[in-house]
Every structure is written in C-alpha cells, then in structure tokens.
C-alpha cells in the first residue's frame, strides 16, 4: 500500500497542524501577558521582556534536543513529554510572584514548545514525497496560526480574571487537546517506504558530493545568516516607525502585514519546492528577502513602508521551511529530527542575534540605515552558501 502522499498522510497532517497550533502557544503567551506582568510586578519594559528572551533560548535549545528525541522515540512520546513539561510550567507560572521565577519557567515552556516546531516538521516530512514541500510549509505555519488564533481568545480572560488564568487555560488545553491528539500520530512509516525515500536522498547527495555533516553545517550557517537579516525588520519595525514619527500603532500594523505575508509566502514556497526542490526555493526566498531589505533604505514614506513591509513578508515566509525540505531531500530519514532540529535551532539563534545586533548598531550610529546594511550583508552570506550548493549539483 502506498504510504507517501496518501489519504492517511493528509489526515496525519491535519492532526499535526492542530497539535502545532496548540503546542506553539507557549512561545506567544508571554507576549500576550507582558503589559500585565509589567504592571503587577512594577518593573520596566526591558525587565518585563526577560521572560520572552528566555522563552526563545529554551525554544532554540529545545529544537535541537527534541529533534534527537523524536528520532529515537517517535513523535507521540515526544509530544507527550513536551505536553507534560509545558503543563507543569503553566501551572507553576500561576503561582509565581516575581518576573525572574516566571522567566525560568518560560525557559522550560519554550523548551517544551519546540517539540511542536522542528520535530513535528521532521516527522510530517516522512509521510510525503511528491507533496513534501507544501506539507512542511503547512506544519511550519502552525507557529503563525497559533499566534493568530490564541491571543484574541485570551482577551476576555485577561480582562476579567488576569494573566494567571491564561496559564490555567493553556494547561487544560495542553492536557485535553495535545495529549489525546498525539496518540493519533503513533503509526510509523514502514521501513520499505523509508528505504525508498533514503535511496532518492542518497542519489541527490552523491550528486553534490557533500557529507551529511558538512551539509548540515552549511545549512546551519545559512540559517543564521538569513535570520539575522530577517530579524531586522521583524524585531525593530515598531521602533523604526516611531523614529520616523509614525507611532507604534503603525509599526504594529506593518508587523501584522509581515506575518500575514509570511503565511502566504510559506504556502506558496511549499508548492514551489514541490516543483523546483528545496535548494532553488531557498535561493528564490533569500534573494527576494535581500531585495526587500534594500527597499527599506530609500523609502521612508508611510504608504511606501506599508508596501515594502508587505513585500518583505511575502519574501521571507518560505525560507525557514526550505531548510527542512533540503534536509529531507538530501539526508537520511532516520536522522531527520536531529538535523532539522539543529538547523531550526540555528535559525532561531540567528533571529536572537540579529535582533540584538540591530539594536546595538542603532545605539552606535543613531540610525537604522547601518542595521539594514548589516542585514543585507548577512543575507549575502546565506545566498552565497545556496549558490555553492547549486554549483556543486552541476
């Protein structure tokens, strides 16, 4: 019986997407409650941001560690382990009375949340061959769906009961939605189907004559480069708009445009990857992102910035999933979780480094122009690695 791209594969994709939508909220919850914890603990905005910073550190490390776990124990046990970690973290967060304890708990919540990103992407990729690109893109979009769906649902709870009850709701959702759904993902792909997929991967990799280790390192460096570049507009667009005199509300709208464009781009690039392959799709996305960064330099009018932000969102959304697609196209399926998780960890580190670096450059120069140029240079590093891989394939 055919397993790749089967009806069961698509059913499994829907279940995995539901798991991702619930599981990834651990990354967004601290963003939702940030103003409330700042007020309750009487702290400044930078201190109130510490929980989010540690969430991202946990999320990055978790992608690497949970990737190895999924290779050894399967996705069901990995999701259950992550659900337990997050549930304990949510319940404990309801009891804290200072931001530092909350920050420590958010590190572990970020760690558990990671299982619903890289490892879930890797597991889903096993069940697709011809439609692997769009399947990976859909699962990777679970992170965006989570950020779009959950925050509006929490508004009434925040206003009536406070931020602690939000954690309580998440604990219940994790127990009663994530864990039951994970049991629907127990079935594993057959060894025969995996061998067929691995044979195709080996043929591709032999054509570029690169070891799995070297390819993973190159993709990791490329991931850091593209995400340092990507972080400049995403992390600093609100501050950039304030500097230009447009105010934070306009910056928030531009960020929303980027995220909406990112979802659309992610899906389009998934379809593109099924036609062209992951490497060429990555080249297209990286090149378009670089062009969008250049466009921020000459344009500072309100309408033009809205347009450029939309263009940026449409260019960058498909870049990160392309790394997972390349890994599955060129490397053994048995190592998919480990290698996808590691590269995803590097992309997240790139976002963190880039966000800090852009702020540091702004502090030195008093302008975001140099920060945009910094992002463009890092983007060129990413593009050069992709071109190297394409050249090796000729």
Describe each model-derived feature in a short phrase.
Residues 30-37, 214-269:
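Extracytoplasmic gate region of multi-pass secondary transporters
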Residues 89, 100-108, 292, 303-311:
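Paired small-residue
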Residues 139-190:
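Helix-loop-helix hairpin linking two adjacent transmembrane segments in secondary transporters
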Residues 62-74, 266-277, 363:
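Helix-to-loop junctions at the C-terminal end of transmembrane segments
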Residues 61-100:
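Conserved MFS/SLC helix-loop-helix module at the cytosolic interface between two early adjacent transmembrane helices
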Residues 115-128, 318-331:
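Intracellular juxtamembrane helix-capping segments at the cytosolic ends
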Residues 11-45, 63-66, 150-151, 232-238:
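Extracytoplasmic
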Residues 77-91, 280-295:
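Structural signature of the two symmetry-related core transmembrane helices
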């Amino acid at each position: 019986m055919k397993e790749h791209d089967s009806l069961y594969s698509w059913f499994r994709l829907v279940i995995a997407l539901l798991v991702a939508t619930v599981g990834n909220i651990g990354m967004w919850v601290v963003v939702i409650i940030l103003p409330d914890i700042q007020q309750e603990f009487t702290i400044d905005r930078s201190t109130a941001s510490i929980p989010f910073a540690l969430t991202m550190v946990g999320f990055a490390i978790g992608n690497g560690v949970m990737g190895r776990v999924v290779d050894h124990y399967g996705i069901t046990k990995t999701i259950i382990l992550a659900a337990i970690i997050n549930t304990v973290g949510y319940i404990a967060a309801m009891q804290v009375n200072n931001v530092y304890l909350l920050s420590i708990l958010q590190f572990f919540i970020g760690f558990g949340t990671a299982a619903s990103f890289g490892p879930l992407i890797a597991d889903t990729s096993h069940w697709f061959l011809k439609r692997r690109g769009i399947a990976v893109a859909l699962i990777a979009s679970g992170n965006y769906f989570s950020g779009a769906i959950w925050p509006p649902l929490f508004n009434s709870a925040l206003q009536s009961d406070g931020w602690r009850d939000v954690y309580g709701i998440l604990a219940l959702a994790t127990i009663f939605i994530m864990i039951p759904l994970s049991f629907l993902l127990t079935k594993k792909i057959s060894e025969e189907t995996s061998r067929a997929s691995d044979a195709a991967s080996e043929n591709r990799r032999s054509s570029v004559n690169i070891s799995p280790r070297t390819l993973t390192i190159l993709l990791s460096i490329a991931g850091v480069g593209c995400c340092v570049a990507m972080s400049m507009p995403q992390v600093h667009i609100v501050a950039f708009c304030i500097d230009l005199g447009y105010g934070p509300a306009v910056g928030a709208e531009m960020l929303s445009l980027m995220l909406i464009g990112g979802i659309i781009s992610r899906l389009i690039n998934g379809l593109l990857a099924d036609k062209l392959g992951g490497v060429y799709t990555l080249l297209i996305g990286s090149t378009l992102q670089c062009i969008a960064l250049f466009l921020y330099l000459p344009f500072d009018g309100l309408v033009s910035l809205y347009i450029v932000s939309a263009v940026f969102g449409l260019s960058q959304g498909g870049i990160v999933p392309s790394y997972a697609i390349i890994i599955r196209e060129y490397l053994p399926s048995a190592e998919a979780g480990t290698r996808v998780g590691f590269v995803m960890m590097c992309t997240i580190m790139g976002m963190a480094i880039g966000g800090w670096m852009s702020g540091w450059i702004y502090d030195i120069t008093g302008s975001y122009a140099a920060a945009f140029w910094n992002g463009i240079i890092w983007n060129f590093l990413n593009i050069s690695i992709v071109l190297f891989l394409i050249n090796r394939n000729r």
